[in-house]
Amino acid sequence: MFTGVRRFDPTQGGQASPVPFKKVKHEEEESKPETNADEHSEVEYEEESGDDSMDEAEEAKKPVEVKDEEESEDENLTADQKRKKKQEAANLAKRAEEKALERKRKREQHMGEEDSDSEDDLAPIKISGNNKIKLAKGTIRAKGFEELPQTEIYEDKPDESATISRKTQLQTQPILRNATYVEIDDVGSFDEFDLSKNMMKNLDTLGYTKAFSVQKAVIPWLLAQQKLLAPDRKPDLLVSASTGSGKTATYGIPIIEKLRDRIVPRIRAVVVLPTKPLVMQVRDVLENLSKGSSLSVVALRNDRSTKRERAVLETADIVVAAPGRLVEQVKENPELFSYIEFLVVDEADRLLGQDYYDWASVLQNNQQRAQAGKTNLTEHYVRNMQTLIFSATLTANPEHIASMDIHNPGVFVIGSSDSYSIPKSLTEIVTHVSAAEKPLMLCELLVQRDINRGVVFTKSSETAARVARMMEIMDADIFHKDWKIAAVSAETSSVHRRRSMKQFIDGKIDFLVCTDLVSRGIDFVVDNVINYDIPSGKREYVHRVGRTARAGREGNAYTFLTGSGEAKWFREIGEFVGRTQEVDATHINSSHNDGYQEALAKLEEEV
């Protein structure tokens, strides 16, 4: 059964010690006076050695004897050179003295703050009812457990610069300086946007009853830009919003509204996404939004011949594609991609990474070639392309967008001004487990928390396959829940992946055990995500947990931690995500160790 963790402390592997609470101070070595390389070549200063040493400021004035070689060199100097050298040494000594005094002042101030601790600060912490334990990096909630003494881990006071808000830090970056920050709760109605009757009908059919914050902020802005007179170049758009916040409709609605009255079919909008499953998902959404119009939405696919693909593209208005296939078609049929008015980059943090720079330059160079030589109004006019960039982690690496030739962008940060953003309705839970018992603890978690459906993330394809098989064996021999389980990774065939995904979405599979391949590629409704292995990157954590708590729904993200190293890494992740709630900590007990050992033996026989 579940029992409450006494205190989750990432630096100590989350372990709590039942001893009277007291502060433990980290000993720090005194650093030497800061000097540059030239200072070391001229004068050296003795370091204070303890309570009996001279005052630091006085000691800094005392130069060490200069070597004989230097004295012999001084004999060859002119009077002016000697005087100049002496003055430089005096200046160095003065600067070192000032630095020493400043360090001493800070140390005395810090010691004074420590001495001001009251007896109440040193009292044991007790957990009862719904008390919350405040940590430097977050809050852990425990419910209904016995009173336990706690051990606080002393942490140095953060630098004053660390207290500056993330919003203030972002505003120091030129491209984000004038960003508009929008609260996640700031929702509205689509009636406010002056949309066409056909679009309103489609939104009603899709069940879009309210406009989420990203839609309320961005859709009116985009619609207003379409009223600008050509040939003025329209401002580009940068949006930082969490996964599942409604980004597809945010750019889809204005694009379709702009293109719905077009006369001649041409590729006027291109949407680029990192994975094929995500391409198909977005294609479906845009098709539903464009119903009742003559617009054609096409997804580029590898299973179509080049000749057949060209025939489809000749009548397309909106193309949705992964970068690899898009580059092939642009190079093969450059004239078809010469009229682009909208370039949408979704999941931009991944698409604009180092491996993807080429696709952006291919598309932009093709657009520039199409405009080259158009010098007068009698020649065919080619519109400037407006770039719309969406990402859950845009503010983490804004330099990535430099390759996109961004023009006077409108910038919107939705829901959080932090570098990473996770859904507000997400509940995060951590539990410490031993590596040897992780498969057993996973099954116990599912049973004890009554989790009947979810996604389990692992670090590798091999781990995904082994965990899925262990779950099947333990379910058959121990838990008898009749789970339907599928493993999905880069090692599985595309046919198997598509079939497993469809079965999971249709409810025919209960648990999907997978690698990060799925964290960005599929949009499905799931209430529980389990990080069997903690991700190696902060942004991967964002995309994993973003599979749940989508579009305002509640969801849970469980993370297994093995050892203090992973616990420390989890805390570092927490420093960068837009966390709005405390992290829950829980512990799992099991009485099925014998059955678990038998299940391991069966797995080894199969392997």
Swiss-Prot record:
SMART domains assigned to the protein according to its UniProt record, in alphabetical order: DEXDc, HELICc
Source taxon at top rank: Eukaryota
Localization (cell): Nucleus, Nucleolus
Chain location of the short sequence motif Q motif per the record: 188-216
EC number(s) per entry: 3.6.4.13
Biased composition (Basic and acidic residues): 25-43
Domain Helicase C-terminal: 441-592
GO biological process: rRNA processing
Residue span of region Disordered: 1-124
Molecular function GO labels: ATP binding; ATP hydrolysis activity; RNA binding; RNA helicase activity
Entry keyword Plastid: no
Binding site residues for ATP: A241, S242, T243, G244, S245, G246, K247, T248
GO cellular component terms, semicolon-separated: nucleolus; nucleus
Motif (DEAD box): 346-349
Sequence similarity: Belongs to the DEAD box helicase family. DDX51/DBP6 subfamily.
Name this polypeptide is given: ATP-dependent RNA helicase DBP6
